[in-house]
């Protein structure tokens, strides 16, 4: 029987899964698009949707709840200052999952998970800023 099987274990312990999804949420918030395996993307979707809902609420308690799940304060700041207002009118469905072929090494099915109305310039912005800062320093 299939009782009490509410999520995928992904061959990881509870602590490892929690840390992995926390890191993936931070990466998705920062870059607004990440490439991962299909099962991880499907498990990440409800987690990040709940984070956006917290950001739409916008109060102090919601900010503290989000900070308890995310590892970096810059991700919490972007979540509440950029993503929350962006999706204020949308009632759910903040992310999409698109199939992206298979990984070369082990043929794992890959997917791209991204925000629906994402900022195209957000992906790689930190790297571009770092390269420009290094160029200015020289």
UniProtKB/Swiss-Prot annotation:
Entry annotated with the keyword Metal-binding: no
Cellular component per GO, a single term: cytosolic large ribosomal subunit
Source lineage: Bacteria, Pseudomonadati, Pseudomonadota, Alphaproteobacteria, Rhodobacterales
Quaternary organization: Part of the 50S ribosomal subunit. Contacts protein L32.
Pfam families to which the protein is assigned, alphabetical: Ribosomal_L17
Keywords for the protein's UniProt record, in alphabetical order: Ribonucleoprotein, Ribosomal protein
Sequence similarity: Belongs to the bacterial ribosomal protein bL17 family.
Gene expressing this chain: rplQ
Keyword Ribosomal protein set for record: yes
Entries under InterPro entries matching the protein: Ribosomal_bL17, Ribosomal_bL17_CS, Ribosomal_bL17_sf
Protein name per Swiss-Prot or TrEMBL: Large ribosomal subunit protein bL17
């Amino acid at each position: 029987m299939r009782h009490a099987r509410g999520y995928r274990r992904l061959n990881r312990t509870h602590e490892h899964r929690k840390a992995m999804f926390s890191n993936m949420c931070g990466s998705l918030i920062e870059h607004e698009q990440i490439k991962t395996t299909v099962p991880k993307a499907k498990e990440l979707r409800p987690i990040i949707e709940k984070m956006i809902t917290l950001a739409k609420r916008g109060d102090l308690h919601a900010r503290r709840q989000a900070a308890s799940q995310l590892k970096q304060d810059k991700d919490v700041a972007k979540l509440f200052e950029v993503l929350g207002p962006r999706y204020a009118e949308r009632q759910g469905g903040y992310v999409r999952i698109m199939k992206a072929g298979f990984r070369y090494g082990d043929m794992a099915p890959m997917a791209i998970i991204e925000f629906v109305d994402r900022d195209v310039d957000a992906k790689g912005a930190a790297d571009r800023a770092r390269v420009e800062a290094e160029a200015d320093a020289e």
